[in-house]
Amino acid sequence: QTLLNKDIKLASPSTLCRLENNIPLETNFENQKILVDTFINSHDAPPKSLTLDFDPTDTTLYGDQEGKHYHGYYRDYCYLPLIVTCDQHLLVAHLRPSNIDGAKHVWAILSLLVKRIRQFWPNTEIIFRADSGLCRHKMLNWCEDNHIKYIVGLPGNSVLNTLSNFFKLHFFCPK
């Protein structure tokens, strides 16, 4: 409330719960924009390069919380928030249920971040970094079309496994 200069009366935990579940999407964007603008304003000069780290992470839930789902990878009931950082700066913290594709919202958030950063620093190199769970072909094509470099993990597949075995055999195993 203080951050956005909005006066909303809160009476009880149930009111808080209703408030959290009914926040307009625009308000969430305003909150995230404050984080990004604070990051931008913390620089005296445009950086030569920025690496945006995208990381979905599990937040284990206890009890009967709204929106709780079991996630097979984490083997627990959890939320799956998407965190975006650049160096030590938090740029985005997006709470999501765990019954979705971990890459959901990544492309949209990356696009909004790139647009905002380039408004202030049009010549700064932007690098998208994420693990294999966020690697999507169309998004990487978008990165290339928009001059965004990327460092992403690739999910295992037969071609990578064959190449990996070749390199292990010929370059990493002592003879």
What residue ranges belong to the model's regions?
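An anionic, glycine-rich sequence signature occurring as long contiguous blocks
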Residues: 149-175
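Short acidic, glycine/serine/threonine-rich loops at helix termini
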Residues: 61-67, 91-96, 137-142, 161-167
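Active-site-proximal, Lys/Arg-enriched surface segment
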Residues: 8-9, 13-82
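Short, positively charged, Gly/Tyr-enriched micro-motifs
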Residues: 1-34, 84-91, 110, 118-119, ...
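Electropositive, glycine- and tryptophan-enriched low-complexity nucleic-acid-binding patches
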Residues: 72-121
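Short, glycine-/Ser/Thr-/acidic-enriched flexible segments
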Residues: 57-59, 89, 97-98, 155-157
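Domain-level cores of phosphate- or acyl-group-handling catalytic modules
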Residues: 100-159
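Generic beta-strand/beta-sheet core signal
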Residues: 55, 85, 93, 129-131, ...
